[in-house]
Swiss-Prot record:
Biological processes per GO annotation: 3,4-dihydroxybenzoate biosynthetic process; quinate catabolic process
Active site: Y23, H100
PROSITE patterns, per the entry: DEHYDROQUINASE_II
Gene name of the encoded protein: qutE2
Gene3D superfamilies in UniProt: Dehydroquinase, class II
Protein name listed in UniProt: Catabolic 3-dehydroquinase 2
Annotated source species: Neosartorya fischeri (strain ATCC 1020 / DSM 3700 / CBS 544.65 / FGSC A1164 / JCM 1740 / NRRL 181 / WB 181) (Aspergillus fischerianus)
Biological or metabolic pathway of the protein: Aromatic compound metabolism; 3,4-dihydroxybenzoate biosynthesis; 3,4-dihydroxybenzoate from 3-dehydroquinate: step 1/2
Classification via InterPro entries: DHquinase_II, DHquinase_II_CS, DHquinase_II_sf
Enzyme class: lyase
Length: 150
């Protein structure tokens, strides 16, 4: 069965309560449940992982090698700082989609640079939590369908 790994980085465990005017009221468990249901409706298994620790995210990316077809990642603040996550994603050769709930380009200057975007199969920015659904749709249509016949 095709599979997607969904990774959420630092502070995304606070979704639903952290700055709801920016990030909305959907909690991380709700987001993950919705993502799993959408993926399952398309015949795809989705695993989710969240960590506030860079090394744990790197380790989880490494573990995906060989049995994951696509990665959807919201790296949170690590977007702007983590060469390690960039190198891990490049190293496992799994296509990935970078997702951000807010439009990072309309926010503080330091949020405008991503260490991941130039290597991503796609970037989905500013669509709220719907961005995760869009990422799943894209992963199934453009990445997974190239490997599997539906």
């Amino acid at each position: 069965m095709p599979s997607i790994l969904l990774i959420n980085g630092p502070n995304l465990n606070l979704l639903g309560t952290r700055e709801p005017h920016l990030y909305g009221s959907t909690t991380l468990p709700q987001l993950e449940d919705n993502a799993k249901a959408l993926a399952a409706s398309k015949g795809v298994k989705l695993e989710s992982f969240q960590s506030n620790h860079e090394g744990q995210i790197v380790d989880r990316i490494h573990e995906a090698r060989g049995h994951t077809d696509a990665i959807i990642i919201n790296p949170g603040a690590f977007t702007h700082t983590s060469v390690a996550i960039r190198d891990a994603l490049i190293g496992v050769s799994i296509p990935f989609i970078e997702v951000h709930i807010t439009n990072v380009h309309a926010r503080e200057e330091f949020r405008h640079h991503s260490y991941l975007s130039d290597k991503a199969a796609a970037c989905i920015i500013g669509l709220g939590t719907y961005g995760y659904e869009a990422a799943i749709e894209y992963a199934v249509r453009e990445i997974i369908s190239a490997k599997y016949v539906y």
